[in-house]
Every structure is written in structure tokens, then in C-alpha cells.
Regions:
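Enzymes that bind and transform nitrogen-containing heteroaromatic metabolites
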Residues: 1-183
């Protein structure tokens, strides 16, 4: 289901925390549709994206955009040489990007359908502001090890309050429980 969503969207957004912790590929792995992988958009306050990451190594002109607030000139040059589009943007309360402004800038770059694969904090912030049209909640039946550090999703109150239409999706492809919420 994730790869189908990636195929259907022309851009995909994550935070640098997700990128550095998970080292995702953020591509469409459906046979024959790989060329339709979305542009990768990363929110990275201080250009902390690891240069050993898959995203950095596979960046080329036009497929990777990073929003940042501040970084050394050396770091900026390194990223630009890889073909990464850097967009300098201010932070709200010196902590978060203005997501509405990020959306406007992404739109100006020709991106019309944005898939956000975010962790707890970013998802909750966007849900709170009612900026999603649709929200897919994937729930794995696997219990994560207590040895792993992770943040459990705690944005349910915003999800239930702001997104009244709810549909269970049965993909028959895996054991994940998927619920689609719409405004």
C-alpha cells in the first residue's frame, strides 16, 4: 500500500530525524513503476541529513528538496553539488517550519500531491492545523521491542475530532490494519 501511495503522489515529505534514523529509500518499488517515484522533500532545520544516507547518495537535479533554516557554507555547497535544491526558511519559535509556507513553496515547484510519511510530532502538528485532506493510519500487529526507542503516535484526539469520515481498508497484502480518515 505504501508504494502505491508513493506512485500516486508526486512528492513525499519527511523530517531529517526520520531520514537519519531509518535511512529510507522513499521510492516506488512496484515493478515497472519505479520511474514514478516522488520528489523527496525533507525538513531539516540545520542540514543534519547524513551524507551517508540513501537519499543523499541518490540525489540528483530535481528529485530532492531540503528546507533548512541555517547551515555552514561548506555544508550548503556539499548539498548543492549533489543536485539537492535547498530552500532557506525561518522557523516558528525557533523550532518548527511554518508548514503552510512549506506547502506553498512546494506547490510553486510544481508538486500537487504531497504524501507525508512523518513521525509523531510532525503528524500531530499537521493534524492539529487540519492541513491533511486524507490521513492513512497504518497500525502494525507487531509489538516493538522495549529495547527500541520510538514515540508512540498520540495525535488520535486531533484525528478523530478533525477527520470525521473513517474507512477501514483491507489490502489483503499484509497484516497491517489501515484506516483512511477524510475531512
Amino acid at each position: 500500500m505504501t508504494h502505491l501511495l508513493r506512485y500516486k503522489n508526486d512528492s513525499l515529505l519527511i523530517s531529517y530525524k526520520t531520514l537519519n534514523n531509518d535511512n529510507p529509500k522513499l521510492n516506488c518499488r512496484i515493478k515497472g513503476l519505479g520511474k514514478f517515484s516522488p520528489k523527496r522533500v525533507i525538513l531539516d532545520n540545520y542540514l543534519k541529513t547524513k551524507t551517508t544516507s540513501y537519499i543523499f547518495k541518490t540525489a540528483n537535479k530535481g528529485n530532492t528538496i531540503i528546507f533548512y533554516k541555517n547551515a555552514s557554507k561548506v555544508r550548503q555547497i556539499l548539498f548543492k553539488k549533489k543536485g539537492i535544491k535547498l530552500i532557506k526558511s525561518n522557523l516558528i519559535k525557533n523550532e518548527y517550519f511554518d508548514f503552510k509556507l512549506v506547502l506553498k513553496k512546494i506547490y510553486k515547484l510544481g508538486c500537487r500531491n504531497l504524501l507525508v510519511e512523518a513521525g509523531n510530532d510532525l503528524s500531530k502538528s499537521i493534524l492539529k492545523k487540519k492541513l491533511f485532506n486524507q490521513f492513512y493510519l497504518f497500525k502494525s500487529q507487531k509489538n516493538l521491542s522495549k529495547l527500541l526507542t520510538y514515540k508512540e503516535f498520540n495525535g488520535f484526539k486531533y484525528l478523530i475530532h478533525n477527520y470525521k469520515n473513517r474507512t477501514k481498508i483491507n489490502t489483503k497484502l499484509g497484516k497491517d490494519l489501515i484506516t483512511l480518515y477524510k475531512r
